[in-house]
Curated annotation (Swiss-Prot):
Keywords: Cytoplasm, Hydrolase, Metal-binding, Nickel, Virulence. This is Urease subunit alpha. Binds 2 nickel ions per subunit. Ni(2+) 1 binds at H139, H141, K222, D365. It comes from Yersinia enterocolitica. Substrate binds at H224. It holds the Pfam family Amidohydro_1. Carboxylation allows a single lysine to coordinate two nickel ions. Residues 134-572 form the Urease domain. Ni(2+) 2 binds at K222, H251, H277. It is an enzyme of class 3 (hydrolase).
């Protein structure tokens, strides 16, 4: 058989098994673990390439015969479940139809079943690109609809959160309260090119207000200290969530007025709960809310302002708190409230706990102490900072950082999908799931996606001057594509609701045109179901110094003064 050098092969078809890829300007390197294509039978689009009539493209099978709608060729997949692999990815009916070898089985060996390329198939050349699942942000304050565009520009295509616009309640809490508001927001998000699931208000001792919100269409309850995060509110929202099979998210009581962290853990009664702000700078029992990350029933996340921990983190957080929670810098009690939440010791520990797989998810806390367009960026910056601070993880092979990278990718893809009950639809690159995918140039991985595929259609991309003679001339901006236009946006985006709402006919009653899918399996999961982030060590916090110990070992790191993929990548 004819042979070519590894370097020449990489130039033609991209890297293969054993090749390594540097991610951006970080010190993180991934290595391809396996290649699902056949050497010498690669599917390649272009002039003089193999995907031509009668060659790699079948010229007699129709779409009714199962031909793909779209194929991404020779791409490097980075997925928390699959690992780091090389493959073609086939898309059909807006879903992932196959991962393996695409082409024409009439003339090619080893074509994966369901991955026939034909006249009905378009192609994206993935030879020198990385493919991930689209990001999921589980902590969205629905303050402004423009958040969706900024999130897509950093590879996030699903929102879970609440609000009704720039009210003070929405600025401070992630809540869409009551059936009328819920209905209007379900109708409003029809115009956004992202998936959306809405959180209702869980601060209720009464059954009626909780039940009516579940039937109206929420995917979960948010219990927030600004509305009173009492033990009774937690117990009753969790009990109703058990009945409805929806999630409960909590921002606990910073002032410890309603009890301490031990009382909140007792109020959980062993039930599954998603804890926002697990570190506490964004809110929660001062100074030791971080202890909840040790509980097997707690699905812990934290938000991106403190990730990675930098020399300016403490200073900017104070002003964030004052604005978001309607506080007055001239009132000493308000100042004390804000200062109680900002603790460099626990912020440092938060970064370490992410690296250890103890805190399982990243989110933004959009416009309410977090940046909606920086989730992937902060994920990779934190991974890089932790490698510099803590060295290689014991799970990583000597020559690559695959495990660490996959641990961090899981925090923004599959784990929030599991936590919110949508992992049967999105969250990973797996056959049968919705084709919500992001393509990255490795030089910009985590910072700037090349394009976002939403439900099988490109709906967001870096695009040059529309009046130019090519797609590439400057100025290159992120722009909406055809997948984000007209009725196609409705076909390719999902509104998630409770099963009770779906059974009650929320789609018809609210006049929704988008896909409407019920969340499920929210109440039967535990932290041990979270991918690569399932650790439950003992966590202690010194009440005087705020030092955090994990299984008796001090968990800390120094703040960084330089971040990867920062000023080199962005103007300003």
């Amino acid at each position: 058989m004819p042979q070519i050098s590894r370097q020449e092969y990489a130039g033609l078809f991209g890297p293969t098994t054993g090749d390594k890829i540097r991610l951006g300007d970080t010190n993180l390197f991934i290595e391809i673990e396996k290649d699902l294509r056949g050497y010498g039978e690669e599917s390649v689009y272009g002039g003089g390439k193999s995907l031509r009539d009668g060659m790699g493209a079948n010229n007699h099978l129709t779409r009714d015969n199962g031909v793909l709608d779209l194929v991404i060729t020779n791409v490097t997949i980075v997925d928390a479940r699959l690992g780091v692999i090389k493959a073609d990815v086939g898309i059909r009916d807006g879903k992932i139809a196959g991962i393996g070898k695409s082409g024409n089985p009439g003339v090619m060996d080893g074509v994966t079943p369901g991955m026939v390329v034909g006249v009905s198939t378009d192609a994206i050349s993935g030879e020198h690109l990385i493919l991930t699942a689209a990001g999921i942000d589980s902590h969205i304050h629905l303050i402004s609809p423009q958040q969706a565009y900024h999130a897509l520009s950093n590879g996030v295509a699903t929102f879970f959160g609440g609000g009704i616009g720039p009210t003070d309640g929405t600025n401070g809490t992630t809540v869409t309260p009551g059936p009328w508001n819920i209905r209007q927001m379900l109708r409003s998000v029809e115009g956004l090119p992202v998936n959306v699931g809405i959180l209702g208000k869980g601060n209720s001792y009464g059954r009626g207000p909780l039940l009516e919100q579940a039937i109206a269409g929420v995917v979960g309850y948010k219990v927030h200290e600004d509305w009173g995060a009492t033990a009774n509110a937690l117990r009753h929202s969790l009990r109703m969530a058990d009945e409805m099979d929806i999630q409960v998210s909590v921002h606990t009581d910073s002032l410890n007025e309603c009890g301490y962290v031990e009382d909140t853990i007792d109020a959980f009664e062993g039930r599954t709960i998603h804890t926002f702000h697990t570190e506490g700078a964004g809110g929660g029992h001062a100074p030791d809310i971080i202890r909840v990350a040790s509980q097997p029933n707690v699905l812990p996340s934290s938000t991106n302002p403190t990730l990675p921990y930098g020399v300016n983190s403490q200073a900017e957080l104070f002003d964030m708190i004052m604005v978001c929670h309607n506080l007055n810098p001239n009132v000493p009690a308000d100042v004390s409230f804000a200062e109680s939440r900002v603790r460099p010791e626990t912020i440092a520990a938060e970064n370490v706990l992410h690296d250890m797989g103890v805190i399982s998810m990243f989110s933004s806390d959009s416009q309410a102490m977090g940046r909606v367009g920086e989730n992937w960026l902060r994920v990779m910056q934190t991974a890089n900072a932790m490698k510099a601070s803590r060295g290689k993880l014991p799970e990583d092979a000597p020559g690559n950082d695959n495990f660490r990278v996959l641990r961090y990718v899981a925090k923004i893809t599959i784990n929030p999908a599991i936590a919110q009950g949508v992992s049967h639809v999105i969250g990973s690159v797996e056959v049968g799931k919705m084709a919500d995918l992001v393509l990255w140039d490795p030089r910009f991985f985590g910072a700037k996606p090349k394009m976002v595929i939403k439900g099988g259609m490109i709906n967001w991309a870096a695009m040059g001057d529309p009046n130019a003679s090519l797609p590439t001339p400057q100025p290159v901006f992120y722009r909406p594509m055809f997948g984000a236009m007209g009725k196609t946006m409705q076909d390719t985006c999902v509104t998630f609701v409770s099963q009770a709402a779906l059974d009650d006919g929320v789609k018809e009653k609210a006049g929704l045109d988008r896909q409407v899918i019920a969340v499920k399996n929210c109440r039967t999961i535990s932290k041990h179901d979270l991918v690569r982030n399932d650790q439950t060590p003992n966590i202690e916090v010194d009440p005087e110094t705020f030092a955090v110990k994990v299984d008796g070992v001090h968990a800390t790191c120094e703040p960084i003064d330089t971040a990867a993929m920062n000023q080199r990548y962005f103007f300003g």
